[in-house]
Every structure is written in C-alpha cells, then in structure tokens.
Curated annotation (Swiss-Prot):
Regions that span the bilayer: 39-59, 67-87, 105-125, 164-184, 193-213, 249-269, 290-310, 340-360, 386-406, 410-430, 490-510, 524-544, 555-575, 582-602
Naturally occurring in which organism (per UniProt): Rattus norvegicus (Rat)
Glycosylation-annotated residues: 157, 227, 239
Pfam families: AA_permease_2, AA_permease_C
Task of the protein: Functions as a permease involved in the transport of the cationic amino acids (L-arginine, L-lysine, L-ornithine and L-homoarginine). The affinity for its substrates differs between isoforms created by alternative splicing. May play a role in classical or alternative activation of macrophages via its role in arginine transport.
Sequence similarity: Belongs to the amino acid-polyamine-organocation (APC) superfamily. Cationic amino acid transporter (CAT) (TC 2.A.3.3) family.
Protein's name in the database: Cationic amino acid transporter 2
Protein's gene: Slc7a2
Cytoplasmic topological segments: 1-38, 88-104, 185-192, 270-289, 361-385, 431-489, 545-554, 603-657
GO MF entry, a single one: amino acid transmembrane transporter activity
Membrane-protein topology: Multi-pass membrane protein
C-alpha cells in the first residue's frame, strides 16, 4: 500500500507553481532588441497568413454569403477576448513561455506541461503545413513541374505519408531556422519586409474591389437564385429555397453567419506568438499588450476589407473556393491582377511560416530552462538566441514537412491553441482574485530594508482579513464577502473557475450532440439546458461578488469575470466541434508527453530542486548566505500565500543587449 505521505508529496509536485522573482524578471539570457512595431508586425504576419486569400471565398460561398463581413466581426470580438487575457499576462509576467508560463505561475506544473506540450504540437504542425503550402504555391506558379518531378522519381505509397517527399519545404524550414538562430533582430526585419508587401497587396485588393464592385451583389433576390439553380439542374434545399440560400445580405440566415464566424475564428489564431517575446522586447509591460491588441485590430480590418471587396466584385455563389481572388479579378476583367495576388500570397505564407516557427523554440527554451524538458534545449548562443531549441525545432518541423501528409493532423493544432486560450482566460480569473503580495526577495542585493517594506505593505491587508482566515465557507462569506481578497476567497474562486469549465463543457456537448432533441423540445434536453445555464449564471455571479486584488499593472482585462468566462465558452465550444479521430490522435500525443514528464520533467523541475543558476557563481558568498537566510525566513512565514499569489509588475524594463 502506498503511504499517504508519498501520495501527498507526489500531488504537491503536480500542483507546485513557478515562483517569479524580481531578479529573474530583470535578468535574461536573450537579447532585448524588439520594439512595439516589431511585435505588431510579428502578430500581423503570423495571423494574416495565406488564409486571407482563400478563407473569405470558402466561407462566403458555403456559409455566410455577403454577411461574411459580420462573421469576421463576430470572430474578431471572440478573438479579442482571448487576446486581452494574453495582454494582461504579458504585462504582469513578461517572460518567455506564453501560455505555458502563465499556467505555471497560476495553476501549477502539470497543467503547465500539458499546455506547453500542446503548444509544441501546434507550432510543429503549423510550421510544417505552412512550409508545404509555400512549396505547393510556388509549384503552382511553375505549372506544377516540381511536384511532377518528385512524383515520378520519389513517389511514396504508404498510408499516412505524403504523396512525395517535399525537399523544397525542408530547405525552407532549415533556412528559416538558420535565420532565427542568427538573431531575432534580423528575423524581425525580414518579417517586417514581407508583412509590408502583404499589407500593400491587400490594400490593392480592397481598392480594386470597391472600384470594380457592385452593391447589387449584396442584394441578389431569392427568385433569381431559384432560376439559377433550376437552369443548372440543381435540386432545391430541404426548405424549398435554392441551395445558394434565400438571397440578400444573409442568404443562409443568421445561423449561417454564426457558422461562418466559427470558421473565421481560426483566421485570428497566431497573435499568441507575441506573448513568447517577453524577454526579447524593450518595455514588455506596455509593448506586449499594445502589440496583441493592435495586431488583432489590423487583421480584422484586413479580413473585413478583403471579404467585402470580394463579395462586391463577384456574386457569392460564383466564388471559387480554392482561388477566390484570382477568379474574381478575371470576372471583373482585371486578369493580370492575379500575379499581384500570387506575390501577396507567397509573402503571407512567408510571414505565417516565420510566425509559426518563431514561438516554437521559445516554448522549448522556457520548458527546458524550468527543467521540464531536456536541459540542452536551454542553451543560448553568443548572439543571445536560443540556438539549440531553434535548430531542434527546425529539424523536427523539416522531417514532418518532408515525409508526412499533414491534412489529417491540422485539426490537432486547434486543440492545442484552444486549450491554451481557455487556460489563459481561466488563469486571469484566478489571478485577479488572489491576495496581493510582494515578489519573492531578489537573491543578491542587501534586501533587509526591502523585505521590511514588503512586510509592512502587506501587514495592513493581513490584519484586515485575519478574522476571516480561520473561518470555513458559509453563505455569508459566499454572498457577502470581505472588501479585500483572502486565501479563502481565492480558493473559492479557483474552485468555481474549474466548476465553470466543467459546466461549459457539458453545455457545449449538449448543444452540439443534442441540438435535435432541443429543437424537438424534448423534456430531458430542455431540463439539462436550463440546469447548465442556471448553474453557469450562478457561478459567474458568485465569482463577480468576490473581492478583486486592487493592485494595477500596465494593462488589465475589463469586465471581469464576464469577458474571460465568455472566452472560455467560445474556446471549449469550438473544441467540442472537433472530430473523434482528432481527439484520439491528441490522446496519443499526450501519452507521449506524460511519459517524458513523469520519467524526466517531474524529477528535474527547478521548482522542486535548488536553483543552480550560472550567475550565482559570481556573487559574494556572504551576500548569498544573507540572501538565503532572508529567503528561508520569508518562506517559513508566508510559503502558502506566496504559492497562491502572483507577483504584480510595477516597473518597466528598458534594458537592451
């Protein structure tokens, strides 16, 4: 029988949180050289990929019609909710790691590893698939001569593998890995160059669309669509309308517009790469929130403008789903414009490839530095770039692009991204209701005065909540809480956030797989629906009643807890829509990850071992001993509260390499 002490120790290992210290925030082995404009270009380039040249036509024809502009608006609002949560964490914890780090400092090590492991999968598949798409687009410009050559001499007839090995994609990935290894500043310049060309091409598309467009294409009558369907000998839909809908601005109704918004949501994925630059940007507390919000705004304007121009130039039912813009320009008599579109598409793929490749080594670097992955991945070059993680990421992505058919794996990207979005939103909720405490003491400054001021700063709030610390949960403390957050209220919020995620998952499953029963007004489905809705509302209102921490940072999510809760709802609902095969593949990937974590990561985690940083060797032994004594004293007095809390950054970093 396993002793209870061993079980308790093992459980504590799984939920231990990363302690972020002042000295670790100030110090970084990476080069602080990126500006706010670099972050905006990185976010726009990563998010505004080749999908802008394809997605609008596909969604407009099948789901939304001209109301695709509304679909993009809804999708943008849902994405901004996730973006705001990332922005607050970027302001609070400006360290490399993105959602992995945010989860680590808030809900513990196991969830952090799951998040980081899923992000690795998402970025690897994203990099490999974009590299193959770049290769395929370039091959199209050469009349598919490259593909025909490799199909003739290197054809592969194996299940799960690609039709032929893509040598061009391999060279592309390795070239990009070399560029990123050389330095982040040089990579940023390349990204800004291609992003600028992409934006110029999209501006050309918008202007051309509004010049050659016809508002009548947004007002097509239902009778006209029926005549077209009849002439093409196409059967009508179930409700007697044309297969192209009922015409007008919303030919498929508002449900079609919402369905289009669910697809368009993925068009805004990519801004999270900005959050991985925390140790490479000047003044990250301001630059990261501005970069995330501005890049999402620019991307929305681009998607909105291109989709409006496209549906004005050409009736939505005639749009080509694979190459909508070239066909639309042919339709209005501007055939040569397709070459401009091709150039923009290649530039968009280039920035999207860099946007997928850029955050991958930084996630590997952050996890390796914390001891959860192999330590060699945390090596940094003389140019202050995570060279080992970058080259490892490049080799893995190149092998994937070289051999595998990635179409079946692309949906797995969505799980990792949506799970990260959900966890970051949940972490914001948990974080904002924690008691505010000072940082863990820096190790090598004469800190006694700072420690005393830290104690004085928290003594007032501690004295005000002393009476509540020992009390158990009660209806009075539940609905009439104290004015300041306590450990009790923080624990309550943490439990309620987990319960809310469970309720939202149940609600999403019911509305996805029981929608027919709800439509038939079956009693069991209506009862379950009402139960989920009432409980969700009660949980959110209870969280809203709890006291928030009053300390301020450069950016904070507004409308708590409603905005993060809605973000969790959107993300979990979209996760439920994924196929069973995708979840099976995801489970296999997670089994592999757990093998690595329980065999290596849990034993080598820095949070469970003494910190052996290189710079400690240069510190005076007397200062180290004094700092160690002060740190151990503080841990003895306040260990549990420090683990529950998270530091709040109140200063700016402008250091540069």
């Amino acid at each position: 029988m396993i002793p209870c002490r061993a079980v308790l120790t093992f459980t504590r290992c799984l939920i231990r949180r990363k302690i972020v210290t002042l000295d670790s925030l100030e110090d970084s082995k990476l080069c602080r050289c990126l500006t706010t404009m670099d972050l905006i270009a990185l976010g726009v380039g990563s998010t505004l990929g080749a999908g802008v040249y394809v997605l609008a036509g596909e969604v407009a024809k099948a789901d939304s019609g001209p109301s695709i502009v509304v679909s993009f608006l809804i999708a943008a609002l849902a994405s901004v909710m996730a973006g705001l949560c990332y922005a607050e964490f970027g302001a609070r914890v400006p360290k490399t790691g993105s959602a992995y780090l945010y989860t680590y400092v808030t809900v513990g090590e196991l969830w952090a590893f799951i998040t980081g492991w899923n992000l690795i999968l998402s970025y690897v598949i994203g990099t490999s698939s974009v590299a193959r798409a770049w290769s395929g687009t370039f091959d199209e410009l050469l009349n598919k001569q490259i593909g025909q050559f490799f199909k003739t001499y290197f054809k592969m007839n194996y299940t799960g593998l690609a039709e032929y090995p893509d040598f061009f994609a391999v060279c592309l990935v390795l070239l990009l890995a070399g560029l990123l290894s050389f330095g982040v500043k040089e990579s940023a310049w390349v990204n800004k160059f291609f992003t600028a060309i992409n934006i110029l091409v999209l501006l050309f598309v918008m202007v051309a669309g509004f010049v050659k467009g016809n508002v009548a294409n947004w007002k097509i009558s239902e009778e006209f669509l029926k005549n077209i369907s009849a002439s093409a000998r196409e059967p009508p839909s179930e409700n007697g309308t044309s297969i192209y809908g009922a015409g007008g601005f919303m030919p498929y109704g508002f449900t079609g517009t919402l369905a289009g918004a669910a697809t368009c949501f993925y068009a805004f994925v990519g801004f999270d790469c900005i959050a991985t630059t925390g140790e490479e940007v000047r003044n990250p507390q301001k630059a990261i929130p501005i970069g995330i919000v501005t890049s999402l705004l620019v991307c929305f304007m681009a998607y909105f403008g291109v989709s409006a121009a496209l549906t004005l130039m050409m009736p939505y039912y005639l749009l080509d789903e694979k190459s909508p813009l070239p066909v639309a320009f042919e339709y209005v008599g501007w055939g040569p414009a397709k070459y401009v579109v091709a150039a923009g598409s290649l530039c968009a793929l280039s920035t999207s490839l860099l946007g997928s490749m850029f955050p991958l080594p930084r996630i590997l670097f952050a996890m390796a530095r914390d001891g959860l992955l192999f330590r060699f991945l945390a090596r940094v070059s003389k140019r202050q770039s995570p060279v080992a993680a970058t080259m490892t990421a490049g080799v893995i992505s190149a092998v994937m692009a070289f051999l595998f058919d990635l179409k079946a794996l692309v949906d797995m990207m969505s799980i990792g991204t949506l799970m990260a979005y959900s966890l970051v939103a949940a972490c914001v909720l948990i974080l904002r209701y924690q008691p505010g405490l000072c940082y863990e003491q820096p190790k090598y400054t004469p800190e006694k005065d700072i420690l005393e001021s830290c104690t004085n700063a928290t003594s007032k709030s501690e004295s005000q909540v002393t009476m509540l610390q020992g009390q158990g949960f009660s209806l009075r403390t539940l609905f009439n809480p104290s004015a300041l957050p306590t450990r009790q209220s923080a624990s309550l919020v943490s439990f309620l956030v987990g319960f809310l995620a469970f309720l939202i998952a149940g609600l999403s499953i019911l509305t996805t797989y029981g929608v027919q029963a709800i439509a038939r007004l079956e009693a069991w489905s209506l009862a379950l629906l009402a139960l989920f809705l009432v409980l969700c509302a009660a949980v959110i209102l209870t969280i809203w009643r709890q006291p928030q921490n009053q300390q301020k940072v450069a950016f904070m999510v507004p409308f708590l807890p409603f905005l993060p809760a809605f973000s969790i709802l959107v993300n979990i609902y979209l996760m439920v829509q994924l196929s069973a095969d995708t979840w099976v593949r995801f489970s296999i990937w997670m089994v592999l990850g757990f093998l690595i974590y329980f065999a290596y990561g849990i034993r080598h985690s820095l949070e469970g071992n003494p910190r052996d940083e290189e710079e400690d060797e240069d510190v005076c032994p007397d200062n180290v001993n004094a700092a160690a004594e002060e740190k151990s004293a503080m841990q003895a007095n306040d260990h549990h509260q420090r683990n529950l809390s998270l530091p709040f950054i109140l200063h700016e970093k402008t250091s540069e390499c």
